[in-house]
Design a protein with these regions (language model features):
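Mature catalytic domains of secreted/periplasmic carbohydrate-active enzymes
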Residues: 1-237
Length: 237
């Protein structure tokens, strides 16, 4: 079974009738296959911004994900230093999810079918981050309107049923995290993803203030690197 079929270009008006015929035939063979919209417009199911993350939450019901090479291009890059790093992957993934999309990292093999060791290492690092923070990424949704972010270093997602909001700090918040657009339920337990210890929090004039334990100021005692997720049950959930 084919989950997704990626078309990569517009072939022009002379070829279009054959392309359309092929698309319709594919739909008959497998109605639930998802087709990339590039070159086929409304016949497609999802679209793919390439080489950039949209600047704001996308006002669309059409699925989308960013495609971005880890090196200098989607083909094999032999230079280790050209690979952008696990921190770059995580930051852009969180940013894309907060805006209602997803993030695909592109890497290419060499002539023998092998991937660069640096690319493999960086993907594994990002995978370790996802093991800790996946609850705030997988099957989540963007928050409404402009609530996807607070400033440059805070991003949000929510569960489909709205019973949990996830705040991601793209920079370590220090001893306190202030969230201005989330109001927790009175009995909400706020915790950092990857830990079981409830965090103390209070409502202030600025919003909700979450206190980070002194022990976590030591990098080695944090559950992950790059970005830190906090799970909150919002008021009314």
């Amino acid at each position: 079974k084919i989950d997704m079929l990626c078309l990569d270009m517009w072939f022009g008006p002379k070829i279009w009738p054959r392309i359309r015929e092929t698309i319709l035939h594919l739909r008959k063979l497998q109605p639930d296959v998802m087709l990339r919209a590039r070159g086929i417009g409304n016949y497609g199911d999802y679209y793919t911004p390439e080489g950039f993350v949209p600047g704001r939450r996308q006002n669309t019901d059409t699925p989308w994900f960013v495609i971005y090479p880890l090196g200098t291009s989607f083909s094999y890059d032999p230079v280790a230093a050209n690979h952008k790093g696990a921190a770059w992957i995580v930051r852009n993934l969180v940013d894309s999810v907060a805006k209602g999309g997803n993030f695909m990292v592109g890497i290419g093999p060499d002539g023998d079918g092998r991937f660069h060791p640096t690319a493999i290492a960086q993907l594994k690092e990002a995978g370790e981050w996802l093991k800790v923070n996946g609850a705030g990424i997988y099957s989540t949704r963007a928050r409404e309107g402009d609530l996807w972010s607070e400033g440059a270093d805070l991003r949000f997602s929510r569960t489909k049923d709205g019973k949990a909001v996830f705040a991601f700090a793209l920079k370590w918040p220090g001893e306190r995290l202030v969230l201005r657009t989330v109001r927790p339920a009175r009995d909400s337990v706020i915790r950092m993803l990857g830990t079981s210890e409830p965090l103390k929090w209070t409502l202030t004039g600025d919003g909700v203030e979450v206190r980070i334990p002194p022990g976590m100021q030591d990098e080695s005692r944090r559950p992950c690197r790059f970005a830190w997720g906090f799970q909150i049950r919002p008021e009314g959930a």
